[in-house]
Amino acid sequence: MDGQQLRSSESPASGGGGVTGGGAPHLFHALGPALLISIGYIDLGKWVAAVEAGSRFGLDLVLLALLFNFMAILCQYLAACIGTVTGRSLAEICHQEYSRPTCIFLGVQAGLSLLTSELTMIFGIALGFNLLFEYDDLITGICFATVVPNLLPYAISHLGKKMVGTLNACIAGFALLCYVLGLLVSQPQIPLTTNVIFPKLSGESAYSLMALLGANVMAHNFYIHSSVVQGQKRSAFAVGALFHDHLFSVLFIFTGIFLVNHVLMNSAAADSTNTLLLTFQDVVELMNQIFVNPMAPTIFLVVLLFSSHIISLTSAIGSQVISQHLFGINLPLSGHHLILKAFAIVPALYCAKVAGAEGIYQLLIICQIIQAMLLPSSVVPLFRVASSRLIMGAHRVSLHLEILTFLAFLLMLFSNIIFMAEMLFGDSGWLNTLKGNTGSPVVFPSTVLITVACVSVAFSLYMAVTPLKSGSHEAELQQEWSVPSQKELLNTTQDREETCAGNVTYEEDQRSDVVPSPRIQPVDCLKSALDYIDSSDTAIESDHDSQHSTAHTSTAPESCHSPSFIPEESKSVVAVDWPEPLEPISNAIVAEESTVESVDSKSTGERDIEVEPALLMDNDKEAPNILESDNKPLGGNNPSCASDDGPPSLTFSRGKGSDAGNGSGSLSRLSGLGRAARRQLAAILDEFWGHLFDYHGKLTQEASSKRFDILLGLDVRTPSSTVRADSQANEIPKSPMVRDNLQGSAFLGSSRDLMSTKNEMSNLDLTYGLQMGNNIGSSAWSQGMQLPSTQLQSSSNSLLDQGARLNSNFSTPSYADNNQFYQPATIHGYQLASYLKQMNANRNPYSSMPLDPQRLPKSSASAVPTYVDSVMHARNQNLLASLGATPSQIAATSRIGTMMAERSYYVPSTLDGNENAGSSAYSKKYHSSPDISALIAASRSALLNESKLGGGTIGSQSYLSRLASERSQYTNSVARPAAPLAFDELSPPKLPGDIFSMQQSPNPSARSLWAKQPFEQLFGVSSAELTKSEFNPAGRSGGMTKDDFSYKESEAKLLQSLRFCISKLLKLEGSGWLFKQNGGSDEDLIDQVAAVEKLLQQGTSDNQLLLGDTQQPPCDKADIQYMRVLPNCGDDCIWRASLVVSFGVWCIRRVLDLSLVESRPELWGKYTYVLNRLQGILDPAFSKPRSALSACACLHRDIRVLNSLRHSSLVATNSIPRQIRGSFTTASVVLEMIKDVETAVSGRKGRSGTAAGDVAFPKGKENLASVLKRYKRRLSSKGQQ
């Protein structure tokens, strides 16, 4: 199509009849293009963005959505004004005003925006096809969506141009009407919120914020709108009226679109709380709960089918305009159709094949985000052209509207900058989902998204500082034309008319120069859609000559000067003889139009007609540009569970029972929790609490026998073992949650008991046992010596060569047959520095493990009186001397004896040991040195395998080989006093290598006095096996009763069960949502515990791989193995019975959160079971006072050790416990949640006439309401106390 045909093209949606200049026909001409453009804002991606924002953040983003809607109205209005005034599209003006590289970049952005719109349209039709015909094959749906929208244009191609334009307008209007009225009328139950809610922004909401921005404003629509209306040229008297018509049309249509978005957000917010929907099926099912009329989803799908035709048409128009003017490529419309479909169907098929329904949902949101990324740089040319006096003349935007455009640009730019900063430096849940850390399929690489965001922001800043080519000459033009001469002021009216006539001819040539290269003639009905011309244009343009004289005679003399873009080019253009095809252009049309521009551009005070567009926004509130992050880390080394799954190496593989990818049948997958995951969650919680409470919240018989009532504070009876207390002893607290805070002095008997003869060996055991802590860094050894696993790995060769040197501590007899398994009982404290220096000096030069001789062990502050210490010291020295120990051994023994233990703990593997082997029923394990059990286990397997491969030679094995052998003995022997080692071919059944092995134990059934501990074997330190109670107050006998053991055993098993339950919860797909809620100190504590457990689980397997352990246990066995030893960092450790109470509060809140959005009666029943059992935790959680929780070293140290695997040194961890953020969950908070659940569940209903609607839903509601009523009754009574 040549320049004449380009000027005469009109909107394909213009369906008005003859236009004589009245207001109504002008309105129809403006309404057609607006309807055509608005269909692009009602596709599936926009709908999903609104529902997702409302389901996750409620009404927090409604005000910002309103601002985005105003921005869309402003942009579309300016685009219509540009096309109407200049008669050119925005792409054509950009081609003239910007350099070629800039135009190409703008064209790439517009093309990407077109592609994302086409992609969302294909997905919308495909999913609509599947839902309408109940067909599950997405590939077939995509093929259907690719072919069907192209059939209608060819079906109506035989119709006339005017009929095609009218039909397009009717289709667009019908689709928009069904979309708006269908969704507004179909759901009267949800009240619309009229209160203005100030936006509550955070890093988590940046994702939904960008999706809403891209859903409300699209960059390619600017070019399409200006191109569609560019043929609607009117006289100066009609331009102002057209402006009002365009404003009214855009405002009317986009107001309806915003109402629909607001209804969707409000409905999703009322029916869901903090929900992340992952599939379109989830969205449809959620909407089924909201809408009363079951026809609403069907109407929406029909709208998608009708709108696909309009979107396909506008995409082809936009592609043609963009490619012709910004790229300089001329293709027919059919070619643009094929190109768009080809580029859109490839990612659609790939996403459907690889990612499924969940991936399609994520891609729909990402498409909206990409649209938002392209906006800041795309609106700069629009705003610059609209405010340019040289281009728009008298119709440039007003100052107030120019300020609004500037604020709109800042809002878009700040939104992109915040999103980019969150992607680069944030740790939000949606970012982990984009990176694939949550187990969700990665449909779009996050690195590509970050790159697009950074490039878009940089290009936006470049465009902001780059003026138009005509703007760069504005000063020169103003200097040339703004100062009128005195001669012009004295000219007569005839002279002024002659001047105007000259300018008419000049402007005619100049306007001809503006017309770009001819356009390609469209084919068939696509041609008719673009070339439809209203018959009324001839009548309007026939009066132009008479309007010229009126315009010229009523203006000042100087107002006849014509503006030019480049004066040098204008002079040359005047002398050019135009070719013949351009002559038919009406000179009267161009001359009149150019004269009006020259008149109004130089005399703003004397205009023919002054029409100021009304302001589009009644408020100029600037959106905040600072997002307040709610998920701040609690410390530099304490990652929060809000980081979902962390790096990819920390992502857990789901268990056998989980069903990843269950997207098509799941309702609202709460941040990845699908239907199967929610079912598994309920089963896990029911299993754990089923060991404690029955379905009435009463303690089970098994739990009562294990004293769980005392542990949890359900029964305040004093244990029978505490009845025999001396009058001088302190009163024993009745609740074990208070007993957890007792110091080591409570474990020591009185001096009378310590000096008794029959307890000398027991006291000696006690002296040596009290030195051992239970967690890393809890004792002096952990503060003085901490070796990371990388050090052990890098210096394993040096340790193998130097290990034998550590065997010279004691001059005790050894056996030549098995001396490779001999291990010294201990390393003297005063010899430690020399040993470290010697190892450091003789180590392998390739070793990177520095042994710091300055880190000497420091004695812990003793909590017992000095008199007791002196008595113990004297008695132990006498006993050691009587057993034949050397003075150096006695000195080392006394030094170790002064080290106090913070707390002790029973190892479950020994608690459930075989009592027939002759051991006591209960035995303790004391842990002091750093937890390197995983390293010992790894080195054991590797070295033993090496030993076997080497022919089983015993005498040549090194120190770590003996450690591995004894580690095997420790892990495979269960409380046997003289049990043979696991590797009989390597070691005889009995090893008398210790200095006390020659002395008979006073208790024949006791285990070996110098049994090696896994944490001590690396340093050669042995610990005593105590047979005394941990809780032994002053004044009591040194003996131990079974009640004391029962208490500690019960606490151990309870905490082990809790730890195993958390580990299973972490393996649920999408478990990140469970551990990133901000609900107070209980939830924060459980979140941090879960984070540490996750790192420890992965750290165990990583250490085995790091040290070359080829025989790795299965996942479940590995978890059980590493959980045999619970962490314990002292009296402030969180691993105590009160942690179970916090976990109970956490479970109540999670189950209520799930019940708030659950719509399946089967899961209602499972939640009811869990809530029934959790009634038992209400008393200790809400009736009794609880002390403030502190983040102990267990929540920090383990993370630091795991994170230091690749460093050469590790700083000792002695952090001060800090308070857990937030306060305890109160009964009133739970009552509010229960009210919300009751309201949400009462509105759920199934389809009438079905078993689900008539039986399952009512019964499920009844059961859930029953347990919630019991909760309300019990919590209400507790709140009044």
Curated annotation (Swiss-Prot):
InterPro entries xrefs: EIN2 (IPR017187), NRAMP_fam (IPR001046)
Disordered: annotated span: 540-565, 593-665
Alphabetized UniProt keyword annotations: Ethylene signaling pathway, Membrane, Transmembrane, Transmembrane helix
Compartments it resides in: Membrane
Stretches assigned to the Extracellular side: 43-61, 134-137, 185-208, 260-297, 347-362, 422-447
Pfam families the UniProt entry points to: Nramp
Result of knocking out the encoding gene: Mutant etiolated seedlings display insensitivite ethylene-response in roots and coleoptiles. Mature mutant plants have reduced shoot length, increased number of panicles and reduced grain yield.
Compositional bias (Polar residues): 548-557
GO biological process: ethylene-activated signaling pathway; iron ion transmembrane transport; manganese ion transport; regulation of ethylene-activated signaling pathway
Ranges per topology, Cytoplasmic: 1-21, 83-112, 159-163, 230-238, 319-325, 384-400, 469-1281
Tissue specificity statement from the Swiss-Prot or TrEMBL entry: Expressed in roots, leaf sheaths, leaf blades, flowers, developing seeds, germinating seeds and young seedlings. Expressed in adventitious roots, vascular tissues of the seminal roots, lateral roots, the connecting region between vascular tissues and lateral roots, mature leaf, mature stem, tips of adventitious roots derived from the node, shoot apex, young panicle, anthers, pistil, stigma, ovary, seed coat and fruit coat pericarp.
Any one of the GO CC terms: plasma membrane
Location (main, coarse): membrane
Residue stretches of biased makeup (Basic and acidic residues): 599-610
Keyword Lipoprotein: no
Gene Ontology molecular function: cadmium ion transmembrane transporter activity; manganese ion transmembrane transporter activity
Residue intervals passing through the bilayer: 22-42, 62-82, 113-133, 138-158, 164-184, 209-229, 239-259, 298-318, 326-346, 363-383, 401-421, 448-468
Membrane topology value: Multi-pass membrane protein
Cytoplasm recorded as keyword: no
Note: Plants silencing EIN2 display a stunted phenotype with severe inhibition of shoot elongation and produce high levels of ethylene. 'Mao huzi' means cat whiskers in Chinese.
Family recorded in the similarity comment: Belongs to the NRAMP (TC 2.A.55) family.
Role noted for this protein: Central factor in ethylene signaling pathways that control development, senescence and grain size. Acts as a positive component of the ethylene-signaling pathway.
NCBIfam families assigned to the protein according to its UniProt record, in alphabetical order: Nramp_1
Record's protein name: Protein ETHYLENE-INSENSITIVE 2
Organism the protein comes from: Oryza sativa subsp. japonica (Rice)
